[in-house]
Amino acid sequence: MGRLFVKICGITRQDQAEAIAALGVSALGFIAVPNTPRYLPLSEMARWVGSLPGPVEKVGVFLDQDPRAIAAWVETVGLTAVQLHGQESPQDCQQLGEWLPGIRRIKALRVRQPQDLEVANLYRDCVEMLLLDAYHPQQAGGTGRTLNWPELARLSRERALPLPWLLAGGLNPDNVLQALSHLQPSGIDLSSGVERRPGDKDIDKVRHLLQQLGSQGWEIAPTLPPITPSATG
């Protein structure tokens, strides 16, 4: 089928991070947003995230935080990518690229209506990847809500996305193949779909996810797309 980038987000425990990385996923996501169920404080993140073995990408997830604070987290922890999950402007993303050369940027778009995809073009020159997530009025992510995959497929045909993109929103080992039958994302992002409870990952569910993908010939991509000149200013 091709290559697929697989990110497991909302990691809170070192033992689970190491076990999931050993299964061969592309990336682990760590939530740097206080007062959220999967928040991992800077002191804890700095203690072990940067030293995780292997080529796995280490993605910090931020929500409307000051670019200077984000840069400090990246440098302190040793993150290899940042995911911006709020209302960050293209200017914020561009500034992060100038401060953090070599760090990939993922801009999340919460899709509620067709117009939500139109803003994707605003970010084409200041991030390396987009993430499409289901809209929730109280939560920015990890809600368990799925997108309308057939409708998203139609919209993405009409409004071709300008960058590689990740599909998020309610994915789990039992529905991921159905989602991929409708869509052709560059990768997938799972959180609640591979958990026992928020922040407590179920390693068997992650293993089952990878087995499901492998059964249909998907190969797991080792890294995010390379940084291109157009995304560095």
UniProtKB/Swiss-Prot annotation:
SUPFAM superfamilies: Ribulose-phoshate binding barrel. InterPro entries: Aldolase_TIM, PRAI_dom, RibuloseP-bd_barrel, TrpF_fam. Gene3D superfamilies: Aldolase class I (3.20.20.70). It holds the Pfam family PRAI. GO terms for molecular function: phosphoribosylanthranilate isomerase activity. Signal peptide: none annotated. This is N-(5'-phosphoribosyl)anthranilate isomerase. It comes from Synechococcus sp. (strain JA-2-3B'a(2-13)) (Cyanobacteria bacterium Yellowstone B-Prime). The gene is trpF.
